[in-house]
Amino acid sequence: MYHTRVPETVEPATINDIVVTLVICKPYNHVPQPHERRALRIKPYWRFRLRGATTLIEMHSLFKCSADYGATMDVVETIPKLTDLNKFKYPSSFMFIHDTFYVPQHFYISEHSLSQLDMSKMTPMIDISLPIRKWMEKKKDQFGPVQVKDIIGIKVEDLVCRLGYPYVYVHQGSCEHVFYFTDLRLMDPQDYPLSFPQLLSDTSFEHNCKVCRRHTAQ
């Protein structure tokens, strides 16, 4: 038996929790072309370890995308301001998990970034899941009833989901990030709960071979 180091100050309430892995896949912001469909794969980009007490606001902040930090303007003569970034011009998003659309109603950013924003010039956040829900209502023979909830007050332990089943985060209108949960287990003292969410891996900078379009280029 190997000796393992156990933290001395771990609250019993912390141990009475769960740990689950969140896998976020490569985003797609366009309809794949025929040559792309042949090699289309759901490629994991990031893996995070979450605890049951992790809030959906914290989980929402883990979705990073280059589309958020672009600016749809002529930058030759004008230096983009923070409010010019797509993240703030088109801030609406949602996460669809099981049968529920989780829709943010407020900006969840750092106080430093918030202090630089003129809220009177900000694009108001809207429920971009509404057109999808209306479309689903027309196809009741194919879809069951769905719910809509704000992400405030929701924790990972409150979610109803299936391990390994794909869910989706949508932002910028049509940019989709497929994600799923795996490796659910009970927490133990060796998990060091103060560091959650934990980044387990990041392969977002790896590029596929241009020939096979499947394996990582060497």
How does the language model describe each region?
Residues 1-218:
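Short linear regulatory motifs enriched in tryptophan with gly/pro/ser
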